[in-house]
């Protein structure tokens, strides 16, 4: 019997061309040679997803969500079959499976479906037959009863980063020893190394800290994947596809309470701010604003309401930049109905966050963060916090300077005194 089962996930940059696909096949073969059973989850090659989306938008400004999911899922189908062919070419038995063939079921929300369950019988049978199983990530199948009582199946996609979620969900359901996420960086860093030359790779980071970093813009891991790993106690390794070097382990960190420090910075350019000026200050108005946005699937982040004067107040909130136009269309008639004086927007902004379990255990973190930004002449427009995170909204053209100032202020280039090998966190936009 094989010693263990390993799930590996390869992102688009790892599969960008035929040479890289062959390199991925060799990496899979090396792991299999150690005696492990292998399931590999693959993203679409390179920029394939963006290219397919652009093609759809060249046909129509508003592609049907069902048809768009069917189209986008083909990118992962292509990768899975090519990786399987590459394995066959070097003598490794393999089979490619779509998300549906792999037993991944989802809810019916096209473009942002959530995994409802995994039935891995087909995967298990192929593993028992001695094959490496290559699964198309980012997708699944929803099932619903039609009007005539028949069950209909529809292809769904999981949203950006959905292949991470596929990999962790399969690792949890199959009882994998670990889930390896191969990407174009070595792991999780204290900040984006493109901004900070001294950014340091982390050897280990806890689920909670990683989840906050992912939520605030660190794009190495998708947030839902981290959540699934945390809930199911899946050990996740973030590794480079292009070099054999130690990565970052995402797992329960027994020293998290003792570290008492900021672990990393995250940033996000995909932000826009909406301000409703002189909103009537009465019960029910906030609901009238935010309920239609929620119904449209728009996620609102930071919310700030000024102290009311003269029966009116200003209400500001942030959302994903891609949702700004839709939000304006929804809010403009509401503004006329409720009597706002003005609706303003700003998309030239960004978020920068400090993250660490130590924030809840010691005073002074907020003061140091705000002081570092002030010393760099960076104005803070909005602030939000959680138990382990402080986020500031700033002008986008000051983002890189902010990241460098905060990295220096919290001395993140220094190794952790409790023990920290080299590893990787804050890469984002």
Language-model segments: which ranges?
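Nucleotide/pyrophosphate-binding catalytic subdomain
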Residues: 1-226, 318, 393-395, 410, ...
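Short phosphate-binding/catalytic loops that engage adenosine nucleotides
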Residues: 36, 92, 234, 298, ...
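Terminal amphipathic helices with adjacent charged low-complexity linkers/tails
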Residues: 42-50, 189, 238-257, 311-312, ...
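Short hydrophobic alpha-helical runs that function as membrane-insertion/retention elements
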Residues: 178-182, 236-238, 301, 381-382
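Acidic/polar loop patches that form or flank catalytic/metal-binding clefts of enzymes
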Residues: 222, 233-239
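Acidic-aromatic/histidine active-site loop/patch
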Residues: 229
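A conserved regulatory-domain signal marking ACT and ACT-like small-molecule sensing domains
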Residues: 247-429
